[in-house]
């Protein structure tokens, strides 16, 4: 009995990253030997993602309300520089995708469009959807995982409770601590969940279906790698004036890996919150910036929209001049920030970008169909970039503020 408990203690206190890597390897091996067995363990991945998605809305709501209600007067939250970093990073991602797509133009083999999908008719519709999400019923926002609405109501409740009795504030602080403990337990189950996700993905696709889109994937993944390993570190260096790679690589390892396999920014919010706590960041800052980042920090989505749109443009033989390319970068960045306000995310915003070049909706929807074919890898890489960048920029802004205060 004692031996069993010591084994469980070792598993509970062991390196989570190492356990996740073992889970990935085990999933690949199982799918290679038996696809049927791999499909049988798919429920482990679904359970893990379901648990994260279930806890994330209430975690965000309570953390935001608690941190604002318990905020001391004259406390710096550093939100403005973080939002600026989010928006600049998204635009830089779109610009990188434009440059890479120009150097390596890609031809698409267009397939049938996706039936039953209705892309937004313009940027106005995307903004309209976001505004209505802002004033969603708070209970409905929690039930549907509408993080824009959850943030709005959490901030509102926090401000309302700012002048409440200390005992009331303490209740929210205790609830916040309790939910954080539950999140830690769920995150410890990541190796089992990722084992199920990897096994199911390899068993169902085998990645054979996406082999024909190798160049398109290469351009997409290269753009994301450039942002993750060159542009983001450069932005962080400008902010903190020291080697950015220890921070960047840690965030990619501890946030990006999980996000890659869950393929959900919402499901990765608890993981990012736990990482921010490990990095000793200001709780008042990250409790707001992380869920906000899951909504508006969409560098990966900007890359997807830009690369697929320019692939369609090149396939149709349309010439792109520099001003149009810059305009596409702006439209892709703004659209990407609204990706959370569109069912289907970044892929269904492609017709919006295609309309800049006079590409018909029928052809644009065929481009979306290509996006769905490569979606297994594209969506995973996009989420990993988006989610890890949330922590990177939050940490950079917090450290820059601390350095400024020391020089003070």
From Swiss-Prot:
Domain of life: Bacteria
Main location per the UniProt record: membrane
Catalytic activity: L-serine(in) + Na(+)(in) = L-serine(out) + Na(+)(out); L-threonine(in) + Na(+)(in) = L-threonine(out) + Na(+)(out)
Compartment(s): Cell inner membrane
Family annotation (InterPro entries): Na-dicarboxylate_symporter (IPR001991), Na:dicarbo_symporter_sf (IPR036458), Ser_Thr_transp_SstT (IPR023025)
Membrane-spanning segments: 11-31, 43-63, 81-101, 141-161, 192-212, 216-236, 298-318, 330-350, 357-377
Keywords tagged on the record: Amino-acid transport, Cell inner membrane, Cell membrane, Membrane, Symport, Transmembrane, Transmembrane helix, Transport
Gene Ontology MF term list: neutral L-amino acid:sodium symporter activity
Pfam families, per database record: SDF
Any single Gene Ontology cellular-component annotation: plasma membrane
Annotated membrane topology: Multi-pass membrane protein
Record carries keyword rRNA-binding: no
GO terms of biological process kind: serine transport; threonine transport
Gene3D superfamilies: Sodium:dicarboxylate symporter (1.10.3860.10)
Its biological purpose: Involved in the import of serine and threonine into the cell, with the concomitant import of sodium (symport system).
Similarity field: Belongs to the dicarboxylate/amino acid:cation symporter (DAACS) (TC 2.A.23) family.
Protein name, entry field: Serine/threonine transporter SstT
Name of the coding gene: sstT
